[in-house]
Structures are given as C-alpha cells and as structure tokens.
A protein has these predicted regions:
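Cofactor-pocket helix-loop regions in the catalytic cores of large enzyme subunits
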Residues: 1-183, 187, 197, 202-225, ...
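Conserved N-terminal structural segment that caps and organizes enzyme catalytic cores in eukaryotes
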Residues: 191-192
Length: 407
C-alpha cells in the first residue's frame, strides 16, 4: 500500500474498490471504509462482477464482465481525458510516456467499452465524473485484480489511473493492494519470490549476489565446493545453486514442470497445492511423478498423501516472531502454548536442515570466519537473531529489532 489504512479511511474523499470483497476478506479495513462512507460522506465506487456487501454503501456499482478490468479502466480514463479532468500539472512534472499512454486509452471510447464490459455508457460517465472531480481518491484492490494471467497489467493500469488523476503522493490517495493472507507482505519482503533476494534486491544484480554471498559465506561462481553423499562418495556442488543468476520458477511453473523433467523435488511449507492450485487432477498427476516431496504442515491435507517426508510445523499460537501486514506494519507475536509433540517452529526446521546440508560441505564453499561471513552458520538462538540478520541485509527493515518492537 502506498498509503496507510488510517490515511485512506480519514483523508480520502472518494474510494474506488475493484477486485476486493473488502468487508469479507479484510473485515477491519472494510469496516473502516464503511464508516468513512457513512460518517464523512465519502463517494464509493465498487467495480465487481458480483454484488458484494460494499455495494450497499456505494454511490455506483460497476458490474463489469469477468476479465474486462483493463477495458473498463481504459474506458474510464478515455472519459477523464475527454472531459479534461486529468491533472495536467502532475502529468507534466512526474509522468513519462504520456503520448503513448493516451494513444492506447483513446482506443476505448465509451460505446466500445460498454460493449466489452457490459457497463452502460451512462454509468461509465457517472463513475468517471466522480473520479475526475472528487479528490483525493484512493484505489483499493485485492486478489480479484492480481489473480489473472494479466494481473500485472491490471495493476499497471490502476497505477496509470491514479497518475492521470494526480492522486499519488497525497494523503487519502495512492494505490493500495490488500494482500491475500496475513503475512504475504512479509514473505515477499523476505525474498519469497523467484526473482529477488530479501527487500526486493534482484537476483540478476551482480552487486546483490556479491552482498549475500559475502554475508552467507558462499564462494564466487567460478569456484567449486566438494560434498559427500550419505555413503561418503564425493560429488561437486556448484555454489550458483545457492546464489542464482537467473530468475527462478513461479509456483504455477514448478509443479507442471515435473512432467517435463525440469522439477525433481519439492519442499512445500504451509501450502496445499492440490486444493489451492488450478486443475486439481493435473496437480495430482504431477505430484505422483515428482521424485521427492517434503511437506511441512500443521495438519493433514490433500497434498499429504504425496509426501515422502512430513515435517510437523507449528500454528501461530505456538511460535514467536513477527508478521508484516498489508500496509507493511511489522508486528510482534508471542507464542501462547508450547509446540505439541514433535512439532517445531518453521525457522528451527529450516535452520536444522541447512546445518545438515552445510555439514557436508568443505571450506571451499563455506567461509567459517564470523567476520567475513557473519550469517553463514544458521546459528540462531531465537527469532530475534533472525531479525538482526534481516535488518542488516534488507534495507527496508533497517533498524527494526525485537527490543524496539516490544516498546
């Protein structure tokens, strides 16, 4: 989110909610939006193929056909340009490529947009008028925008709308995605994506790879390390396996790639792809063929039947640490009960696995000096040690510590 939830609720004069059933999926923020409409008279526009709860409070409901988000947004921006409601000063001072952008938008006149989306021409004009004349307006979206094959383009088009209107960098404006689960933001911040290290430092960057290689004690790419397998036989490990130069696979790529022989093992943590990913029959077929599957979970799932190894994790009530919420607020949590049975916190399981892998390596790969490689050993005593590493290597988390969060 470019603006905080309090900022949006207290300063926005208009709200555009698209692809988000906010009161159901984000009830706290949804309640804040409803209060803003009822108590401050904020103008609310909802764009959703369904009639959701927020529609009861909306000035307009744009009930467009599924998958026509870009056409809808381009059509609205056509009208904004036609009526001269764009923020010319903001565009001149802060935007690039306006002529190319305008040429694209002008391909979506209201009649064509209405035909594509199913939204009447009159409703399009009323929505564009609110957007163009009531400032500032906050744009809010969730999985209904991102979970598409054109999800990135959907988001870029929403950003174009806000730049066209000059609603960026102001209280009550901005582009505000609501994340799908409570710590999705934190997982992404920590590099839980195929193309970045923690804090969105690109894996394709020589500088970023060198930074993490030094901190984690990994050699340069042209150096090799020896390892021994369980029978004591030597084999060669290329350190680029740990510091990749190329962007990795997404979830929707790695599982189908099993059938193509490109994925041989899966380590799944807190996820049930059989139920969550599209085409369940295809996912089952892939998991039946994978050479090795490790599943780290807190309860049996549809995916459990395909696991070669099951590792018992813990629930939120059994672990301490931090969550980063949708507005990037870092919050401390403390365990309420001790882990049950053989279950362990996820960080302990991961660290123990890493230590056992590192035990197979020689110093040709791993620097043992704490000065040259301060985070090479996975020797964490608590989650506060992990946070210390995070704020040392992830600039956006610099200065954050458990001690400060406790205050």
């Amino acid at each position: 989110m470019s603006n905080s939830m309090d900022d949006v609720a207290n300063f926005a004069q208009a709200l555009f909610v698209i692809g988000s059933n906010t009161t159901e999926q984000h009830p706290v923020f949804g309640t804040m939006l409803r209060r803003a409409v009822k108590n401050r008279g904020v103008r609310l526009i909802v764009a959703d193929p369904r009639r959701i709860d927020l529609c009861e409070f909306a000035a307009l409901h744009l009930r467009h056909k599924p998958g026509t988000d870009i056409a809808l947004l381009n059509g609205l921006m056509y009208i904004i340009l036609e009526k001269g409601w764009e923020d010319k000063k903001f565009i001149q001072e802060h935007c690039e490529g306006f002529d190319e952008f305008k040429a694209t938008v002008m391909q979506y006149p209201p009649e064509k947009t209405s035909e594509i989306t199913g939204v009447s021409v009159g409703t399009l004009y009323r929505a564009a008028e609110i957007m163009g004349t009531v400032k500032p307006m906050a744009v809010i979206w969730a999985m209904g925008i991102t979970q598409h094959i054109v999800g990135v383009r959907n988001v870029m088009t929403l950003a174009n709308l806000q730049m066209l209107l000059g609603n960026m960098g102001v209280p009550g404006g901005g582009v505000n995605p609501l994340r799908g689960q409570n710590n999705v933001q934190g997982a992404c911040d920590m590099g839980g994506l195929p193309n970045v290290f923690p804090a969105y430092q690109p894996v394709t960057s020589d500088e970023a790879r060198a930074k993490f290689a030094k901190a984690w004690g990994l050699t340069k790419k042209d150096e090799f390390g020896k390892m021994k397998d369980e029978k004591g036989a030597d084999f060669i490990l290329h350190p680029s396996s740990f510091i990749p130069e190329k962007v990795g696979m997404t979830v929707t790529e790695m599982i189908p790639n099993i059938l193509e022989g490109k994925t041989h093992a899966l380590y799944i943590l807190g996820e049930d792809p059989v139920m969550s990913d599209p085409d369940t029959a295809h996912i089952r077929k892939c998991l039946e063929k994978v050479d090795f599957l490790v599943l780290q979970e807190i309860f049996p799932s549809e995916t459990s039947a395909y696991a070669d190894v099951l590792l018992p994790g813990v629930s939120f009530a059994e672990k301490s640490g931090t969550f980063t919420n949708t507005e990037r607020r870092v919050q401390m949590v403390h365990k309420a009960i001790q882990p049950l049975g053989e279950a362990r916190p996820d960080w302990q399981i991961t660290a123990e696995l890493a230590k056992r892998i590192l035990a197979l390596q020689t110093s040709e790969v791993l620097e043992t000096s704490e000065v040259s490689a301060p985070y090479a050993g996975w020797d964490y005593n608590s989650t506060s040690d992990i946070m210390a590493e995070i704020n040392a290597l992830a600039p956006s988390y610099a200065g954050i510590s458990h001690a400060r969060l406790e205050k």
